[in-house]
Regions:
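Histidine-acidic metal/acid-base catalytic patches
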Residues: 1-29, 41, 52, 87-98, ...
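N-terminal small/glycine-rich loop or linker at the start of catalytic domains
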Residues: 1-9, 59-72
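Short, flexible active-site-adjacent loop segments at beta-strand->alpha-helix junctions, enriched
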Residues: 11, 39, 62-67, 106-108, ...
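Glycine-rich, proline-tolerant flexible connector loops at the mouths of alpha/beta enzymes
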Residues: 32-54, 104-108, 141, 201
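Conserved beta-strand positions in the central sheet of alpha/beta enzyme cores
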Residues: 34, 60-62, 101, 133, ...
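Short loop/edge segments at beta-strand edges and connector loops
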Residues: 37, 134, 169
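Active-site acidic/histidine proton-transfer and metal-coordination neighborhood
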Residues: 52-53, 72-166, 256
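Conserved radical SAM core fold
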Residues: 64-70, 107, 198-204
Length: 258
């Protein structure tokens, strides 16, 4: 059983310039990368050259986050949302991203905002060839965010019914809002496009606290998940000093080879 980990540059080595974070991810044996919205602000030629040189794949990136953490569900802002979605699709496909995360934004959860989000997601799907991800975000982390629970995300996906629309299953957020990770994964497995991990209590390194990832991650694999595990956590100190949490899983890999 092999575990591949994706370095989230929005959190790991955040104190360093963006391209330096990528180099350190390679140096510290990450299999792939995932971005927030950094590619919107840098030279894409330099980025593509570095990704090619380091032979790192890219799981995904975000649309512009802005002050409202996206705006795709905010009524009255669809022109802005669709302009930013189109720009992000162009960038994501140019740099070889597997997926684009469309943030809904901070707005009330009601039928008008639901319809707005659905319309803008349909626009994204029509104008792209890559995976489109939506992510439930817990109230504690981001008060007022439109999409909070995995059931809400699943309802949106059911309404649109498109094979390239999936859920970003962030274990930190799912645990806070919906509880039992494995139960929720099983219930929505066919709708999950990417998994992210962090400690439950403080969003630090994934092997601290109540979530036993040494058990949970192998279970995700046994239940059919084949993707990388996104490391979107807040390091408790220098990023490289806290990477030993991966060691028990690497040991599991070696045990299965014997």
């Amino acid at each position: 059983m092999k575990f591949n980990f994706s370095a989230n540059t929005g959190y790991l080595w955040r104190e360093l310039p963006f391209l330096e974070r990528i180099k350190l991810a390679k140096r510290h044996h990450f299999n792939s990368l995932e971005f927030h919205d950094e590619p919107h602000e840098i030279n894409l030629t330099d980025l593509k050259k570095l990704l090619y040189q380091l032979e790192l794949s890219l799981n995904g990136m975000n649309v512009r986050m802005g002050d409202t953490f996206g705006c795709a569900a905010i009524p009255g802002r669809s022109d802005q949302a669709q302009s930013e979605i189109k720009q992000a699709i162009t960038i994501a496909e140019d740099i070889g991203a597997r997926a684009l995360h469309i943030l809904s934004g901070v707005t009330e959860y009601n039928q008008t905002s639901i319809n707005t989000f659905i319309s803008n997601l349909e626009f994204a799907l029509k104008n792209s060839k890559i995976l489109i991800l939506i992510e439930p975000v817990c109230e504690e982390q981001l008060p007022g965010y439109f999409l909070k629970t995995i059931d809400q995300a699943a309802d949106i996906i059911n309404c649109i019914n498109h094979p390239r629309l999936k859920i970003m299953f962030d274990c930190y957020h799912i645990d806070k809002e919906s509880g039992d990770l494995l139960k929720n994964f099983k219930a929505h497995a066919n709708k999950i496009g990417h998994i992210q991990i962090a400690a439950a209590e403080n969003r630090a390194e994934p092997f601290e606290g109540k979530l036993n990832y040494r058990y949970i991650l192998p279970e995700f694999k046994r239940l059919g998940y084949q993707g990388d595990f996104g490391c979107e956590y807040r390091p408790s100190g220098p990023t490289e000093d806290g990477l030993s949490w991966r060691d028990p899983l690497f040991e599991m890999e070696n045990e299965t080879k014997i």
